[in-house]
Amino acid sequence: MIILQTQRLTLRELTLDDVDFILALLNDPDFIRFIGDRNVRSVEDARKYLKGPIESYERNGFGLWMVENKAGTPLGICGLIKRDSLPDVDIGYAFLPEFRSQGYAFEAANASFAFARDTLKLSRLLAIVSPENDRSIRLLEKLGMKFERMFTMPNDNEELKLFAINLS
């Protein structure tokens, strides 16, 4: 199901048909370095991973979405996540290396912000990012998000930067 469209992009719900793309994205060295190793090494692992976003659509009315160009080429994922460890919804995104530095993440994230504000009526949005991920930090700042504090996820010892923006 298509959720959002921008000038260049379509954001749609992930499906089990997206296993090959998810397998490639989650094994990209930058994904593993900056976001984390999800231990997705096979098509079956990718199917299991995809159940998370699919269940989030049903439970929350949002989740991580596939980002495609107008030709239908998968570029990355972007969307909204509700984590038990955070007080508010956060935004997440990741793109294949060949589609970075072309403004796609900014465009997809901007559309996700508008969805969070206008459709979900959220007043605040968070983002968590590795302190070493300079490109992602610059993107969050360009989107108007402000650094609030360092944050550690439960069951993880890596400190992350927590960013926030008021949408209302």
Residue map of PLM features:
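Acyl-donor (CoA/ACP) binding surface of acyl/acetyltransferases
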Residues: 1-34, 51, 66-168
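Short glycine-enriched, charge-decorated loop/helix-capping segments at active-site entrances
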Residues: 37-40
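Short amphipathic alpha-helix in the helical subdomain of ABC transporter nucleotide-binding domains
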Residues: 42-46
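A short helix-loop-beta-strand connector motif used in the catalytic cores of GNAT acetyltransferases and
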Residues: 54-66
